[in-house]
């Protein structure tokens, strides 16, 4: 599942993270299609399904089973930024935002008898990869995490979104009736900076060489309607969970690359797209 270094024992497709990963595990989505009997006997716990927060929030529940379309899921992974962290004696509650929907509650139980790394609180503003079980209590969904690992390389954010697309397309092709339409809607409208187009079609900023931070800031500036453009102070207010230096570096990069330009002064910016 997870190795001693905090990563997957066999990542998606077994590429660079060890062998026997998501695409190659027995009965996994990269294996030959199992028979109906095998499908029924296979435990959901053998599958770790890459998802977006939007998909998890829209998943349907029948008894203790969650589904996206016809696909069962129990163990899931999400990648996002920590917006809030609150530590209690027995657990840590995070709000993790992958910018496809409202931030999702992620609860990690801690060992009260040991001062292990699992008991350390990940600070807000950090990107993390969460692996855990989808749960619902009083009609509110959350993830109970068995592992939360920091994401240092933003390529992992983009890689996760590609894993999401591949996993749910594969589940769709296995679960959809022959000749039928799509059984699993990806439902990833994108909410980078509360504006659309984050992960859909050709407007995906991640494919244009931008990091998630840069994409979020660019979309905020695009969505601002004032004639003078968005002020840097307004950016800081909107991105209160993000480090000021990170915001400044992203703004400088976007300006140098021609995505935005300054207007009335060096602290107001508009998008060169003219949206």
From Swiss-Prot:
One GO cellular component, as annotated: chromatin
Molecular function GO terms recorded: damaged DNA binding; single-stranded DNA binding
Transmembrane annotation, as ranges: none
One GO term (biological process): nucleotide-excision repair
Keyword annotations: DNA damage, DNA recombination, DNA repair, DNA replication, DNA-binding, Nucleus, Phosphoprotein
Disulfide bond entries: none
Compartmental location: Nucleus; Nucleus, PML body
Keyword Phosphoprotein: yes
Post-translational modification: Differentially phosphorylated throughout the cell cycle, becoming phosphorylated at the G1-S transition and dephosphorylated in late mitosis. Phosphorylation increases upon replication fork stalling.
InterPro entries: NA-bd_OB-fold (IPR012340), RFA2-like (IPR040260), Rfa2/RPA32 (IPR014646), RPA_C (IPR014892), WH-like_DNA-bd_sf (IPR036388), WH_DNA-bd_sf (IPR036390)
Residues of the DNA-binding region: 76-150
Main location class: nucleus
Disordered, as annotated region: 23-47
UniProt family annotation: Belongs to the replication factor A protein 2 family.
Assembly, per entry: Component of the replication protein A complex (RPA/RP-A), a heterotrimeric complex composed of RPA1, RPA2 and RPA3.
Function noted in UniProt: As part of the heterotrimeric replication protein A complex (RPA/RP-A), binds and stabilizes single-stranded DNA intermediates, that form during DNA replication or upon DNA stress. It prevents their reannealing and in parallel, recruits and activates different proteins and complexes involved in DNA metabolism. Thereby, it plays an essential role both in DNA replication and the cellular response to DNA damage.
Entry protein name: Replication protein A 32 kDa subunit
Organism: Xenopus tropicalis (Western clawed frog)
This protein's encoding gene: rpa2
């Amino acid at each position: 599942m997870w190795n001693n270094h905090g990563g997957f024992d066999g990542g998606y497709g077994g590429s660079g993270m060890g062998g026997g990963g998501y695409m190659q595990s027995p009965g996994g989505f990269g294996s030959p299609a199992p028979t109906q009997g095998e499908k029924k006997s296979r435990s959901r716990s053998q599958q770790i399904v890459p998802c977006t927060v939007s998909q998890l929030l829209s998943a349907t529940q029948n008894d203790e089973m969650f589904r996206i379309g016809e696909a069962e899921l129990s163990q899931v992974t999400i990648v996002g930024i920590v917006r809030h962290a609150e530590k209690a004696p027995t657990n840590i509650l995070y709000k993790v935002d992958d910018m496809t929907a409202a931030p999702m509650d992620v609860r990690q139980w801690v060992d009260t008898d040991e001062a292990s790394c699992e008991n350390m609180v990940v600070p807000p503003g950090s990107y993390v990869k969460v692996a855990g079980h989808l749960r619902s209590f009083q009609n509110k969904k959350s993830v109970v995490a068995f592992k939360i690992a920091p994401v240092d390389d933003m390529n992992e954010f983009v890689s996760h979104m590609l894993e999401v697309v591949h996993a749910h397309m594969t589940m769709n092709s296995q679960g959809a009736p022959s000749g039928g339409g799509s059984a699993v809607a990806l439902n990833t409208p994108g909410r980078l900076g509360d504006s659309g187009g984050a992960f859909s079609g050709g407007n995906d900023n991640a494919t244009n060489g931008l990091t998630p931070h840069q994409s979020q800031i660019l979309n905020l500036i695009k969505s601002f309607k004032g004639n003078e453009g968005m002020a840097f102070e307004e950016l800081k207010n909107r991105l209160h969970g993000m480090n000021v230096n990170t915001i400044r570096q992203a703004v400088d990069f976007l300006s140098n690359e021609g995505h935005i330009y300054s207007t009335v002064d060096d602290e107001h910016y508009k998008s060169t797209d003219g949206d």
